[in-house]
Amino acid sequence: MKALLLSAYDAESHRLWRHNLQAMFPLIQWHELTLPARYFPWRVRGNSLSWAFNHRATLTDNYDFLLTTSMTDLSALRGFVPALARLPTAVYCHENQFAYPVNPDPRAPRPNPVEPQMLSLYTALCADQLVFNSAYNRETFLQGVAELLSKLPDHVPAGLVERLQHARVIPVPLSEDVFAPASRSIDASEADVLNIVWNHRWEYDKGPALLLAIVEELIASGLRFRLHLLGQRFRQAPAPLQQLQALLERHCAALGIEPGHSGYIADRQSYCQLLASADVALSTALHDFQGLSLLEATALGCTPLAPRRLVYPEYLGPEFLYDTTGDNGEETAAEAHTAVQRLRDWAQRKALGQTLPKADVQRFRQSSLQADYAALLHALTASQVTARQNTDNTPAEG
C-alpha cells in the first residue's frame, strides 16, 4: 500500500504525529511532503502553490490514499493537481484557528483570522475522513465554523456544519519511549525541593504571565522549589519569561538550590531523562488542543498540574486541575493562588516521603491507538475499492 502524507506547517507536534504514524504502520510505503513551521500567513495560503509547482512529480504518483494536516490548502492544491481529487483523503486537525487566543502585546501584528479560518473549512469539506486530536478541538472548530458562517452576508450553503459532524477523534500517539520504566530515585538532600518542569513553547499562548504570577507567589511563600524552563525558544521571548529567568536565578541563589535547566533540549534522550527526574509538570496554557508536552511528562512519571480549561479536563481528573477565570485566559492573582496551593500541598507530601498522585495516560500510547488509526486507514482504502468498483461497473459510452 502506498500513501501520500502532506504536512503543510510541520511544527514539532506535527512531526511527532507523522513519525509515530509511520512507526505504527511500517508496511505502508509513505511518501511525504512537508513545509517548515514559519511565516504562518504565507505558509497556510501558499502551501498549495509551493507544492503544486515544485513537487508535481511526487503529487501525481500512484497512491492508495492521501493523509494531510488541516494546514494544507487542499481545495487549491486539488485545483492545481486534479489527480489528487481522485484519492481517498483524510484530513488531520492538530489545532483550529477559531480557538486561538489574541496576543496581548499591543506591538504584535494583528492578522485577519478569517482567511485561515476559511481555508481550514475548505480543507475540512474536502475530506472523506475528518479527524481531530481531541473532542475539545472538534467542538471548538464546529462552533467556530457555525459562528463564522452566520456572519457571512449571503449565498451561504445550508448544512455545512452538519457535513462535518461525522468527524472522528483520534489523539496524536505518544512515542513508546516515554512509557519505558524509569528509575525515579530521590536524593535525600533534595527531599524538601519540589522539582517543577514547564515544557512549552516560549510564546504568549502558553501563558507566561500566569507562570510568572505563580512563581512570584511560590517565592513569596518560602517554598523550596526548582523550575526547569524547557520548550522551543524564538527570537523574541515574551517579557514575562525574560523576567522569570532573573527571578529564578535570585531565588535559587538565596536558598542554595541548584538552578533548573533553562532552554530547549534537542537531544531526545536527555529531554526524557530530565522529565523523568521531575516531580511536577506544570501548564499555564491559553491554547492547547491536546497538550503533548504535558502528556509526555506525565507518561514519564511527572504529576501534571494544568488549568481547568481547554483540552485538559478531557483526560485529567480534578486533582490535577487548578481553577481558572475561564477560557479567555485572563491571568489573575486568584488563578495563580489555586495552582500554588496545589504545589505547596505536593511539596509537603514529598518532604514527608509520600508519593505524589499520578495520572494514567496509557490510552495515548501508540499501542493503545493502533486500532483507531487502523480503522481510519481501512475506511479510506475501502472507499477507494468502492470507487473503483463503481468505475468498473459504469457502462461504456457509444
Model-predicted regions and their roles:
Residues C126-S185:
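Donor nucleotide-sugar binding/catalytic pocket of nucleotide-sugar-dependent glycosyltransferases
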Residues L286:
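Aromatic "clamp/platform" in nucleotide-sugar-dependent glycosyltransferases that forms part
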Residues T303-A306:
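Short hydrophobic beta-strand element within catalytic cores of glycosyltransferases
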